[in-house]
């Protein structure tokens, strides 16, 4: 059964839209945990467009579940991670012009630069996950980097038409199986919603789903604790679809 990591970046987005002090994402992380979140995820971007350094520092002190720090593979971010010591670091690609992360990290092309970063973090006892597309070449490179975890990019599945979703789901399912065969542990995330999460949650060996925007959007109507409860219920008990043999979207 997959666990739920709640990404609270979008709480910080609201704050930064007015360059003010509220809403503070730190107490919202506590509410997410009260709603059943198994972990809290934040992305400290190089441009600090939403989550700020003080958020990460305070979250490290207050999160009672697990703190997953998403960050670019840069020396600055590695130093921050070593100082904060989150429960996990997820290395992700970044482009300043993007609204949100647009694809997986090209580990195969960046292996020589990523490997020493992975090694340095893991030597300090910080598990490292690499956010990648479900491609064998990338997954093999992840294994070669020394990382023990991958987070499979689900954006293409989330953006696919109804007719194309089964094919995208099969690709991610095969990627998860390949990752496990390589000795990697598997998380997934990006673009998952209340409508499409169940098939991903039903993938064998899926350990954690990191979900943010849809939960924060739902929270506007029902509150964050209830929004988290609803998402966790879908992940824990995905319904089966008799047509495709996987969970209903």
Swiss-Prot record:
One of its GO terms (cellular component) is cytosol. It comes from the Bacteria. It comes from Parasynechococcus marenigrum (strain WH8102). Pfam families: PdxJ. The record marks 151 as: Transition state stabilizer. Keywords: Cytoplasm, Pyridoxine biosynthesis, Transferase. The lineage of its organism: Bacteria, Bacillati, Cyanobacteriota, Cyanophyceae, Synechococcales. Its EC number is 2.6.99.2. Pathway: Cofactor biosynthesis; pyridoxine 5'-phosphate biosynthesis; pyridoxine 5'-phosphate from D-erythrose 4-phosphate: step 5/5. Belongs to the PNP synthase family. This is Pyridoxine 5'-phosphate synthase. The keyword Cytoplasm applies.
């Amino acid at each position: 059964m997959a666990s739920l990591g709640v990404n609270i970046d979008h709480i910080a987005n609201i704050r930064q839209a007015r360059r003010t002090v509220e809403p503070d994402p730190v107490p919202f992380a506590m509410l997410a945990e009260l709603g059943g979140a198994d972990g809290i995820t934040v992305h400290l971007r190089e441009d600090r467009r939403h989550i700020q350094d003080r958020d990460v520092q305070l979250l490290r002190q207050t999160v009672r579940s697990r703190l997953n720090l998403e960050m670019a593979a840069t020396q600055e971010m590695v130093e921050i991670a070593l100082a904060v010591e989150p429960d996990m670091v997820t290395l992700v690609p970044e482009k300043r012009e993007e609204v949100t992360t647009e694809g997986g990290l090209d580990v195969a092309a960046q292996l020589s630069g990523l490997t020493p970063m992975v090694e340095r973090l893991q030597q300090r006892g910080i598990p490292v996950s690499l956010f990648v597309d479900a491609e064998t070449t990338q997954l093999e490179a992840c294994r070669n980097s020394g990382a023990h975890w991958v987070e499979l990019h689900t954006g293409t599945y989330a953006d696919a038409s109804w007719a194309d979703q089964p094919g995208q789901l099969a690709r991610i399912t095969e990627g998860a199986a390949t990752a496990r065969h390589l000795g990697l542990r598997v998380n997934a995330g990006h673009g998952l919603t209340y409508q499409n999460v169940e098939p991903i949650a039903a993938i064998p060996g899926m350990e954690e789903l990191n979900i943010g925007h849809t939960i924060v959007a739902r929270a506007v109507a029902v509150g964050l604790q209830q929004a988290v409860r609803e998402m966790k219920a879908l992940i824990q008990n995905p319904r089966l679809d008799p047509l495709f043999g996987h969970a209903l979207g």
